Curated annotation (Swiss-Prot):
One of its GO terms (biological process) is DNA-templated DNA replication. The keyword ATP-binding does not apply. This is DNA polymerase IV. Residues 3-188 form the UmuC domain. GO terms for cellular component: cytoplasm. Pfam families: IMS, IMS_HHH. PANTHER family: DNA POLYMERASE KAPPA, DNA REPAIR POLYMERASE UMUC / TRANSFERASE FAMILY MEMBER. Keywords: Cytoplasm, DNA damage, DNA repair, DNA replication, DNA-binding, DNA-directed DNA polymerase, Magnesium, Metal-binding, Mutator protein, Nucleotidyltransferase, Transferase. It catalyses: DNA(n) + a 2'-deoxyribonucleoside 5'-triphosphate = DNA(n+1) + diphosphate.
Length: 354
């Protein structure tokens, strides 16, 4: 397998730089404002100039302004970023056998057949992709090329920004042997510290530890994931799906618990959510915003996806379960969220259109 992982560099801030060239080279911070005060809210992302000053994603805006008072602060404009993402994802799709959209600014491409199994041709394709995105959208991306998804992401992370990282099949074992445990996707800082305490500093240390002890710390799924990666047996395929959820929420005419009143709005939310996707969701979640603005949710996963016709009945059942769980409060808003979309790749452009 030949996988190309594409990561759009500091995406939201970079789009703002493209649309506002005067921002280029200056500290730029994209913010999500809460609206309570002029400085309330959090940092969504920052360009590298702002990061050098200590600004980080998730940081309160007021703190960012204290450490980087001269930076440019702009509000997040998600529809614009989505439009850029859609165009880039469609471009990527043209170069892939399969495309798995991991987020608004990340995607995995299986290009094995496209390059006829020739790894060096895969590297050349990655270069072509970088250049094409730059020419058409003025956006730099970092790309990783490797024999599997995880390695492609890791080498891309090591190559930021605007880089091209490569792990050839002959280099995989040496790379795995020297890989720090905290560099592995899915291993957060807290879990990494616990693994360090067990004597696991490098991925290779997994092979010399008691598997049952590892499982107690990480859980079954993650222990198996780490073991397969350490043994160089990780082979999860790239799938034609999107991990970007699609949702729709509607305000009821009045606060109520009456299912007959809520259902038409829930059905409308389902219709509008399904209209956003070109494919079949594997998970559906009903979300109820209560009269006191508390949020309740209940979801269900389907191995082979769920059609819109079946979604109506499933959503009604989930709604009734929520109302049984909360027997007192009225519902103010009702919504539905669709996750893990199995993409209809033959018409992928419809999936990404806003």
């Amino acid at each position: 397998m030949i996988v190309i992982f594409v990561d759009f560099d500091y995406f939201f801030a970079q789009v703002e730089e493209v649309l506002n060239p005067q921002y280029k080279g200056k500290p730029l911070v994209v913010c999500v404002y809460s609206g309570r005060t002029k400085t309330s809210g959090a940092v969504a992302t920052a360009n590298y100039e702002a990061r050098k000053l200590g600004v980080k994603a998730g940081m309160p805006i007021i703190k960012a302004m204290q450490i980087a008072p001269s930076a440019i602060y702009v509000p997040m404009r998600k529809p614009i970023y989505e439009a850029f993402s859609n165009r880039i994802m469609n471009l990527l799709n043209k170069h892939a056998d399969k495309i798995e959209v991991a987020s608004i600014d990340e995607a995995y491409l299986d290009v094995t057949n496209k390059v006829e199994g020739n790894f060096e041709n895969g590297i050349e394709l990655a270069r072509k992709i970088k250049q094409e995105i730059l020419e058409k959208e003025k956006i730099t991306v970092t790309v990783g090329v490797a024999p599997n998804k995880i390695l492609a992401k890791i080498i891309a992370d090591k190559s930021k920004p605007n880089g091209l990282g490569v792990i050839r099949p002959t280099e995989v074992q040496d790379f795995l042997n020297e890989l720090d445990i905290d560099e592995i996707p899915g291993i957060g800082s807290v879990l990494a510290r616990r693994l360090n305490e067990l004597g696991i500093q490098k991925l290779r240390d997994i092979l010399s530890k008691n598997y049952n002890e590892l499982e107690k710390i990480t859980g079954k799924a993650k222990a198996l994931y780490l073991l397969k990666l350490a043994q160089n047996k990780y082979s999860e395929p790239v799938e034609n799906k999107s991990k970007i959820p699609h949702g729709r929420y509607l305000t009821l005419p009045y606060n109520t618990r009456d299912v007959k009143v809520i259902l038409p709005y829930l059905k409308k939310a389902i219709n509008e959510a399904y209209n956003k996707v070109n494919g079949i969701p594997m998970r559906i979640t009903v979300i109820a915003i209560m009269e006191d603005l508390d949020i309740l949710s209940k979801g269900k996963k389907f191995k082979h996806g769920i059609s819109i016709d079946n979604a109506y009945k499933v959503a009604e059942d989930l709604l009734r379960e929520l109302l049984v769980r909360d027997k007192r409060r009225n519902v103010r808003r009702i919504g539905v969220k669709l996750d893990n979309i199995i993409i209809n790749k033959t018409n992928l452009s419809d999936f990404f259109d806003i």
